[in-house]
Amino acid sequence: MNGVATTAALNLARHLQGAGITNAEVLAVVAKTPRELFLDAALGHKAYENTALPIGQGQTISQPYIVARMTELLLESRPKRVLEIGTGSGYQAAILAQLVDELCTVERIKSLQIQARQRLKRLDLHNVSFKYGDGWQGWANKGPFDAIMVTAAASSVPQALLQQLADGGVLVIPVGEETQQLMRVVRMGDQFHSQTIEMVKFVPLVNGELA
């Protein structure tokens, strides 16, 4: 990052800390990750604003606060192998890849997946596996996972994702249609314990259809 971007990223991390993000590792990674790399050049001047922005194909790059909050929730269990549903721009994947040993990420829109792969390569992040597929189905032959993060809102919690959680694993997922809640689900044997975190607004998690 150039000096201006570095300062802007540090200021964003400070803003997120003021907004309630407490995990120092998450804040440090936000402060050194060039968010402008994940946006069209025309939106680059907005890269370090705490707002969601369009990335094409009807999708968005999530608000930095939500990226940090979901990452913080996921890291509470100290996961090593993580599944991300909805690669999108690749920004959330870039944050996660710097904090976990192995990241697997699934995207249903081929053009977005190609761009995200190129961006993570530019950042020299090589602990990421990419799949073009239906996020509702997860990535069964790569599981089980210590944690799963879903970056689009599901109408209900996908059963396939619950089954791909390791015992003690954590699923962080927005659930709902018009009204959405961020949920944290923990697997304990065959039992699943869910906790509502806060109200959120995400694009929908599309079931089955690839683009």
Curated annotation (Swiss-Prot):
Molecular functions per Gene Ontology: protein-L-isoaspartate (D-aspartate) O-methyltransferase activity
Highest taxon of source: Bacteria
GO biological process: methylation; protein modification process; protein repair
Alphabetized Pfam families for the sequence: PCMT (PF01135)
Localization in the cell: Cytoplasm
Keyword vocabulary terms for this entry: Cytoplasm, Methyltransferase, S-adenosyl-L-methionine, Transferase
Active site per database record: S62
GO cellular component: a single term: cytoplasm
HAMAP family: PIMT (MF_00090)
Described function: Catalyzes the methyl esterification of L-isoaspartyl residues in peptides and proteins that result from spontaneous decomposition of normal L-aspartyl and L-asparaginyl residues. It plays a role in the repair and/or degradation of damaged proteins.
Family: Belongs to the methyltransferase superfamily. L-isoaspartyl/D-aspartyl protein methyltransferase family.
Designated name of the protein: Protein-L-isoaspartate O-methyltransferase
Biological source species: Shewanella loihica (strain ATCC BAA-1088 / PV-4)
Lineage: Bacteria, Pseudomonadati, Pseudomonadota, Gammaproteobacteria, Alteromonadales
